[in-house]
Amino acid sequence: MKKRSVSGCNITILAVVFSHLSAGNSPCGNQANVLCISRLEFVQYQS
């Protein structure tokens, strides 16, 4: 389950990067990226 969360997070980051490539920088995409990274750190901290 923890690995599944991390995988979903990585997919989110890839989607954000792809979004940036096609639409340029967007504050919303940046925010999602930060939230995702924070979630990854939290999962690592828990384990």
UniProtKB/Swiss-Prot annotation:
Its main location: secreted. GO terms for cellular component: extracellular region. It comes from the Eukaryota. Transmembrane segments: none annotated. Induction: By CD40 stimulation in dendritic cells (at protein level). It is found in: Secreted. The keyword Protein transport does not apply. Residues 1-24 form the signal peptide. Keywords: Secreted, Signal. The keyword Signal applies. Expressed in Peyer patches, spleen, thymus, liver and mesenteric lymph node. Expressed at high levels by dendritic cells, and at lower levels by T-cells, monocytes and B-cells. Enhances IgA secretion from B-cells stimulated via CD40. This is IgA-inducing protein. It comes from Bos taurus (Bovine). The lineage of its organism: Eukaryota, Metazoa, Chordata, Craniata, Vertebrata.
